[in-house]
């Protein structure tokens, strides 16, 4: 019987989901493994003893981080105490690099092995973080093959586990059945709205999406809108921004993407999820002007959407800051719905993404890495 313990640390909804899938795979591989950590609802449901709720820690932008500093500091202090009093056999840090790289140092100080799952985007900005990774991380589990090559070049132990979204299950229901379930007409266009999972994203982006929706309706009166509610958000949080035309659902995002003709999305992992389902999309991004200015100085990338970053050529229009207006969003969605040649061109490009990212079940691949680290 194993008395080994693993700590899973996730600070955002996307990491919470990855942590939940990893927990399930670890339990299948090693049923007696003790799992605890920092996360949200999904990890809790997967059997992880979550002793730090990460819901308040999911922030975007430099200024926004300062506003949540007290909660972040409290989480750090709690983990440091845990490392000293109840050291696990391994800590798995999932994404969330600003927080997790700092805590990886604390884990190593306590003599604990460290696995980092989902690489910080050192290829985009602050490549110097590779020094911390070399010093404090025993093994990297990365989602993209180019990241594996990067770490191999730097002599960092690494496994390319594939991207979990590339192997995500598809709904068992037909398109018509899903539309019936959501009370939507399968013969009329459906646009999915993804305003993000963080409160400040919702506040900035959802009102714009709602206004864009009204403009789209003037051009396409039959259009239908659907908004999948992020697990960490209550309906009351977004209700003030909504119009009656938008149908809010609490369901697996795969059901929404199975019926959507187009999508409007905040930048982030969701853009890749949408793209992998070959749903044409437009990406919008808006943060505090100072945050954006600082980001432009630090980040050396042509694109902000993950689907554009991993594709050989851009697959989605990006509307950033002052360019993100209701009219600009409406114009692009209209093209995605009504311009047949343009639409087919985008769908064709989206079709090339999955083969690049699929390595089977990513969570099972990471679980094997965990198993090797704690039993080696």
Curated annotation (Swiss-Prot):
Its EC number is 2.4.1.182. Disulfide bonds: none annotated. GO terms for cellular component: membrane. It catalyses: a lipid X + a UDP-2-N,3-O-bis[(3R)-3-hydroxyacyl]-alpha-D-glucosamine = a lipid A disaccharide + UDP + H(+). Pathway: Bacterial outer membrane biogenesis; LPS lipid A biosynthesis. It is an enzyme of class 2 (transferase). One of its GO terms (molecular function) is lipid-A-disaccharide synthase activity. Keywords: Glycosyltransferase, Lipid A biosynthesis, Lipid biosynthesis, Lipid metabolism, Transferase. SUPFAM superfamilies: UDP-Glycosyltransferase/glycogen phosphorylase. GO terms for biological process: lipid A biosynthetic process. It comes from the Bacteria. Condensation of UDP-2,3-diacylglucosamine and 2,3-diacylglucosamine-1-phosphate to form lipid A disaccharide, a precursor of lipid A, a phosphorylated glycolipid that anchors the lipopolysaccharide to the outer membrane of the cell. Belongs to the LpxB family. This is Lipid-A-disaccharide synthase. It comes from Coxiella burnetii (strain RSA 493 / Nine Mile phase I).
């Amino acid at each position: 019987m194993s008395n080994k313990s693993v700590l899973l640390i996730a600070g955002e909804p996307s990491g919470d989901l990855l942590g939940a899938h990893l927990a399930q795979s670890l339990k299948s591989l090693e049923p007696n493994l003790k799992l605890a950590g920092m996360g949200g609802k999904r990890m809790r449901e997967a059997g992880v003893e979550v002793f730090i709720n990460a819901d308040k820690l999911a922030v975007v932008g430099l200024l926004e981080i300062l506003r949540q500093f007290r909660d972040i500091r409290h989480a750090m202090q709690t983990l440091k105490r845990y490392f000293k009093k109840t050291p696990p056999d391994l800590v798995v840090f999932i994404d969330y690099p600003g927080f997790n790289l700092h805590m990886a140092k604390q884990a190593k100080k306590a003599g604990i092995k460290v696995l980092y799952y989902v690489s910080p985007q050192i290829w985009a900005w602050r490549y110097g973080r590779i020094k911390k990774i070399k010093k404090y991380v025993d093994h990297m589990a990365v989602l993209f093959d180019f990241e594996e090559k990067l770490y191999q070049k730097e002599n960092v132990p690494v496994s390319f586990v594939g991207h979990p979204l590339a192997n995500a299950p598809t709904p068992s229901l037909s398109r018509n059945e899903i539309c019936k379930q959501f009370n939507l007409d399968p013969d009329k266009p459906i646009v999915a709205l993804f305003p993000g999972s963080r409160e400040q994203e919702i506040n900035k982006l959802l009102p714009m999406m709602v206004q864009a929706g009204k403009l789209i309706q003037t051009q396409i009166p039959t259009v239908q809108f659907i908004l999948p509610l992020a697990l960490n958000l209550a309906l009351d949080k977004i209700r003030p921004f909504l119009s009656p035309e938008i149908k809010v659902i609490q369901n697996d995002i795969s059901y929404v993407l199975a019926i959507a003709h187009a999508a409007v999305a905040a930048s982030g992992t969701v853009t890749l999820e949408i793209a992998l389902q070959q749903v044409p999309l437009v990406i919008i991004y808006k943060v505090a002007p100072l945050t954006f200015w600082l980001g432009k100085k630090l980040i050396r990338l042509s694109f902000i959407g993950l689907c554009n970053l991993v594709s050989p050529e851009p697959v989605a229009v990006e509307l950033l800051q002052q360019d993100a207006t209701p009219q600009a969003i409406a114009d692009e969605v209209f093209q995605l719905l009504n311009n047949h040649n343009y639409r087919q061109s985008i769908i064709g490009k989206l079709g090339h993404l999955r083969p690049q990212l699929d390595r089977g079940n990513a969570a099972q691949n990471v679980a094997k890495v965990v198993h090797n680290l704690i039993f080696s």
